[in-house]
């Protein structure tokens, strides 16, 4: 079973200000925790559209959401194609969209998926198992300079060059095939003093490779921009992020869309096309309560941001 403890459940869904007759999108179906709580609040006129690029998640969600299946549409797709998929399914605008970014617990806990540095498994890390690029290709075929770039940019790893050099040296003699082999090379590349603090030494490198394999930041940016366009005025977007790169991206997009541009002095009235598109519902991100962290330690880095659309200037 795709067993996953849902993070910030009520805060995320309640933040959407659910209209029972509305149309809502869960861009990251996963274990269907958010979807189940949301669909329970919908009337027979309401609709929930669930995206996931992992077919296992969709198949399991169909079982979990069986009592409400008449209100649910499942879309097997990366959420970066949010706009085109919604339009293809006949939805021109929706009333709310939620995102729970990052890897779901079942993906982490299934060794053969290759996401976890705690299990020895083939280097994979694909969220969409039909995709072609895997962690094996990144680790064994990408140039030293490209490895340094992703380790530093996506993993914020101070020892990016040292780790990339260890990988480059090791793969000359034989391919690096497993997560266990990669973990050992990472440990060799990071000085002992640095390894003793800041959690598992492989955490940042694995994050960087995972983001590169799945183009997570590019997909999130594309999707969030489309989400702003696709929601009705009064509709909301809830986004849970799990690391600073995701949160920074989300914060930047929302800040830009909720800010006034530079205006000429003494302008008597602000034209509609210059007014902000969004209003920030959460000035500062919502974080899990102590009670939630007691039962789900994986939620410790989660941050929730919620915005509301107040101007439809972007639509034709």
Swiss-Prot record:
<dbReference type="InterPro" id="IPR029063">
    <property type="entry name" value="SAM-dependent_MTases_sf"/>
</dbReference>
<dbReference type="InterPro" id="IPR023397">
    <property type="entry name" value="SAM-dep_MeTrfase_MraW_recog"/>
</dbReference>
<keyword id="KW-0963">Cytoplasm</keyword>
<feature type="binding site">
    <location>
        <position position="107"/>
    </location>
    <ligand>
        <name>S-adenosyl-L-methionine</name>
    </ligand>
</feature>
<dbReference type="GO" id="GO:0071424">
    <property type="term" value="F:rRNA (cytosine-N4-)-methyltransferase activity"/>
</dbReference>
<feature type="binding site">
    <location>
        <position position="79"/>
    </location>
    <ligand>
        <name>S-adenosyl-L-methionine</name>
    </ligand>
</feature>
<feature type="binding site">
    <location>
        <position position="52"/>
    </location>
    <ligand>
        <name>S-adenosyl-L-methionine</name>
    </ligand>
</feature>
<comment type="function">
    <text>Specifically methylates the N4 position of cytidine in position 1402 (C1402) of 16S rRNA.</text>
</comment>
<dbReference type="Pfam" id="PF01795">
    <property type="entry name" value="Methyltransf_5"/>
</dbReference>
<feature type="binding site">
    <location>
        <position position="100"/>
    </location>
    <ligand>
        <name>S-adenosyl-L-methionine</name>
    </ligand>
</feature>
<comment type="similarity">
    <text>Belongs to the methyltransferase superfamily. RsmH family.</text>
</comment>
<dbReference type="GO" id="GO:0070475">
    <property type="term" value="P:rRNA base methylation"/>
</dbReference>
<keyword id="KW-0949">S-adenosyl-L-methionine</keyword>
<feature type="binding site">
    <location>
        <begin position="32"/>
        <end position="34"/>
    </location>
    <ligand>
        <name>S-adenosyl-L-methionine</name>
    </ligand>
</feature>
<dbReference type="GO" id="GO:0005737">
    <property type="term" value="C:cytoplasm"/>
</dbReference>
<protein>
    <recommendedName>
        <fullName>Ribosomal RNA small subunit methyltransferase H</fullName>
        <ecNumber>2.1.1.199</ecNumber>
    </recommendedName>
</protein>
<keyword id="KW-0808">Transferase</keyword>
<keyword id="KW-0698">rRNA processing</keyword>
<keyword id="KW-0489">Methyltransferase</keyword>
<dbReference type="InterPro" id="IPR002903">
    <property type="entry name" value="RsmH"/>
</dbReference>
């Amino acid at each position: 079973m795709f067993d996953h403890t849902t993070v910030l459940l009520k805060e995320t869904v309640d933040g959407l200000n659910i209209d029972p007759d509305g149309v809502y999108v869960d861009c990251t179906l996963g274990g269907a925790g958010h979807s189940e709580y949301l669909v329970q609040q919908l009337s027979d006129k309401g609709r929930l559209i669930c995206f996931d690029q992992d077919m296992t998640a969709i198949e399991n969600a169909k079982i979990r959401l069986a009592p409400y299946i008449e209100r649910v549409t499942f879309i097997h797709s990366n959420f970066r194609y949010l706009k085109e998929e919604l339009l293809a399914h006949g939805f021109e605008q929706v009333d709310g969209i939620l995102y729970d970014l990052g890897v779901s617990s079942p993906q982490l806990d299934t060794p053969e998926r290759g996401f976890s540095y705690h299990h020895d498994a083939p280097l994979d890390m694909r969220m969409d198992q039909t995709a072609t690029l895997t962690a094996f290709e990144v680790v064994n075929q990408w140039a030293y300079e490209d490895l340094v770039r992703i380790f530093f940019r996506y993993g914020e790893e101070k020892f990016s060059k040292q780790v990339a050099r260890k990988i480059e040296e090791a793969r000359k003699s034989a391919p690096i095939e497993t997560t266990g082999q990669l973990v050992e090379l990472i440990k060799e590349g990071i000085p002992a003093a640095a390894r003793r603090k800041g959690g598992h030494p492989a955490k940042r490198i694995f994050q960087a490779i995972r983001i590169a394999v799945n183009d997570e930041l590019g997909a999130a940016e594309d999707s969030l921009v489309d989400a702003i366009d696709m929601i009705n005025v009064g509709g909301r977007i809830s986004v849970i992020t799990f690391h600073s790169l995701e949160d920074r991206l989300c914060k930047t997009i929302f800040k830009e869309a909720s800010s006034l541009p530079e205006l000429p002095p003494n302008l008597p009235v602000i034209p509609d096309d210059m007014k902000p598109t969004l209003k920030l519902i959460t000035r500062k991100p919502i974080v899990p309560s102590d009670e939630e962290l007691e039962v789900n330690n994986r939620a410790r880095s989660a941050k929730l941001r919620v915005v509301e659309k107040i101007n439809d200037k972007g639509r034709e």
